């Protein structure tokens, strides 16, 4: 028969309390800043996207991978970029699309602008398929500020374009 004496268990060794970090603790009460930063490195395009996507409805968007980029923006993946944020709707019925680019070289700006113009025109010419989508693409905005470019197809494209352009007037 099994022994009725309780099994001996080894107590875990006491560990030292964690050492105090020399780094300041994050301030949990501070609101995170979603304003794009303008600084030594210029405009942070991901911060700009985060800011507008919290203001405007960009539901069901996914990151644009190289395969999608090559299909919808031929030539864009060959451009050397300092920053790239590409978002595309997961469903074809939505015309929401956003491309934010900082070209590494000013020599590429005209080529990128032409690629963005071609995408817009392709969608307007029927690529967007649905009348509402085509209409939205007709009012899509393309902005160029130095090495920074944006294409936005959205119901609030003009407002988003104004916010993008305002980043460069500060």
Feature locations, PLM:
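Mature, Sec-exported extracytoplasmic domains of Gram-positive
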Residues: 1-170
């Amino acid at each position: 028969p099994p022994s009725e004496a309780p099994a001996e268990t080894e107590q875990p060794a006491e560990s030292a309390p964690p050492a105090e970090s020399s780094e300041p603790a994050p301030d949990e009460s501070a609101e995170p800043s979603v304003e794009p930063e303008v600084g030594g490195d210029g405009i942070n395009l991901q911060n700009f996207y985060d800011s507008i996507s919290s203001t405007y409805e960009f539901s069901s968007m996914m990151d644009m991978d190289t395969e999608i980029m090559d299909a919808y923006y031929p030539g864009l993946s060959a451009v050397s970029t300092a920053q790239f944020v590409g978002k595309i709707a997961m469903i074809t019925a939505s015309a929401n699309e956003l491309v934010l680019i900082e070209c590494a070289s000013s020599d590429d700006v005209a080529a990128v602008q032409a690629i963005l113009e071609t995408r817009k025109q392709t969608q307007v010419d029927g690529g967007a398929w649905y009348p509402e989508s085509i209409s939205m693409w007709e009012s899509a905005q393309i902005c160029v500020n130095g090495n920074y470019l944006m294409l936005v197809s959205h119901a609030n494209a003009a407002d988003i374009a104004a916010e993008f352009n305002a980043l460069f007037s500060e």
